[in-house]
Structure formats: C-alpha cells, structure tokens
C-alpha cells in the first residue's frame, strides 16, 4: 500500500488470530488502506470476516465461494467488497449482491479458477457490469498492465509477481528458483 497499490493480506488457511496479528502488523507499517483476501471455503472464513470489521480493514477480496452471506456485515462497516470472478455470470451476480468492484481472473492466475484467458475475460466482464473491473492472471509487467487497461480494466492484480519479494515468507530456495527461471 505504501507504494501506491492496494496491499492485500492473504488470510489463506491461517487461524483467525494470526490474521488479526497480520492486520495489526500492517497497520504499524502503513497509514494507507489495505485489504484482506478471504478464501470463503476455509472453515475460518466467518471468523476472519468478522475480524476484518473489528480491525477496521478497508477492503476485502474473496475467492473460493460466494461472499453473499457476509455482504451486509461488510457493507454496514464501510468495507469495500471485491470478489474474484471467472465468468460474466459470476460478475453480474456479484454486482447484484452489492460488490463494489470485481476482479476478473483469467486461467493464467495462480488461483486458476476458470478456463477463459484474462485478456478474453476482461472485456466481456467490463461490458457486462457497471462497477469497476480489475484484471488478474498472467500480468507481470507494464505491458500486461497496459493491455488490461486497453481492454477496459480500471486496475490490475498481481500475486505471483511478488513471490520473490523480501516481504514474501516463501523459502529462499524457492525465491532463487523463481528469479533464475527463463520461461
């Protein structure tokens, strides 16, 4: 977030109190808005959904499920809700449910939730909804970002691109292999 993007804490399968600790650490490092990603199939999703509100997190991204049951809780707390979608139908459903933004995630993403490529999915979703669309999947540099913007996305999401960053908790051997990779 300090660099100008919206930093996201990946809750993954972390215990709820670990997520709370990470949120508090993030607050110590920035006064900028940041979000938490919640995998909704995770058994801790409900607890983490509440922690987001209790800790005053400004945004939540969701995957692996429908955030509908948490929408009222988050919206009443002023949390921006940003679900990840892999189809036009899901994007429309999330817009009707009250999402503020959708992430159109193509098959190139680490989450690989659909069978449509990012560059094919983004313009379809942009044309189908009236809320902002963020492109995700296979975007690793300015060229991918520019392409997403040309297709109507208002932002991009990158994840794998940051695996080798100093902030990543991935093992150093893995980071080194990523850095050395040619293709």
What residue ranges belong to the model's regions?
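Active-site entrance/lid segments in N-terminal catalytic domains of soluble metabolic enzymes
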Residues: 1-132
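Conserved active-site-proximal phosphate/metal-binding subdomains
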Residues: 120-134, 140-183
